[in-house]
Amino acid sequence: MSQASRALKAYRNALRATSVAFKNDVATLDAARNEIRTHMKSQEDPKGTNRSIDERLKLLDEVTVFLRHNIVQGRKVDEGKYRLNIHKDTELGDNDDIKKKKDGLSNGGFTGCCGGSGAKTT
């Protein structure tokens, strides 16, 4: 596949991913698409790292995967309640890694974020 056709495919996939991730949020959808469009039109690497075109396309593919799998929209329905737009591509973890690490959160009598208030325990 030529580099131009790979770039077009990556660009289209990124735009589709924004449609899924930011459905019904016109402002965020437009901002995300403008950002992608700006970077695609740019001849230079925006961070100045001199990445090759292949590396930039790989990065765009990774952004696309991240948008599809890790971004979930939430809409407030009641005070303190939100409805999440979980779709078929949303990555749903089982939290096994988090459960395993929870035992190691206490450190020297202090408990951190998920383990409590952060106050010293005796």
Swiss-Prot record:
Localization per Swiss-Prot or TrEMBL: Mitochondrion matrix
Superkingdom assignment: Eukaryota
InterPro entries in the cross-refs: Complex1_LYR_LYRM7 (IPR045298), MZM1/LYRM7 (IPR050435)
GO molecular function, one term: protein folding chaperone
Chief location category: mitochondrion
Alphabetical UniProt keywords: Chaperone, Mitochondrion, Transit peptide
Ranges of biased composition (kind: Basic and acidic residues): 92-104
Transit peptide as recorded in UniProt: 1-17
GO CC, one annotated term: mitochondrial matrix
UniProt entry tagged with the keyword Isomerase: no
Spans annotated as Disordered: 92-122
Intrachain disulfide bonds: none
Record-level GO BP terms: mitochondrial respiratory chain complex III assembly
Sequence ranges of Gly residues compositional bias: 106-122
Family from the record: Belongs to the complex I LYR family. MZM1 subfamily.
UniProt subunit comment: Interacts with RIP1.
Function: Assembly factor required for Rieske Fe-S protein RIP1 incorporation into the cytochrome b-c1 (CIII) complex. Functions as a chaperone, binding to this subunit within the mitochondrial matrix and stabilizing it prior to its translocation and insertion into the late CIII dimeric intermediate within the mitochondrial inner membrane. Modulates the mitochondrial matrix zinc pool.
Name of the protein described by the UniProt record: Mitochondrial zinc maintenance protein 1, mitochondrial
Organism: Komagataella phaffii (strain GS115 / ATCC 20864)
Gene: MZM1
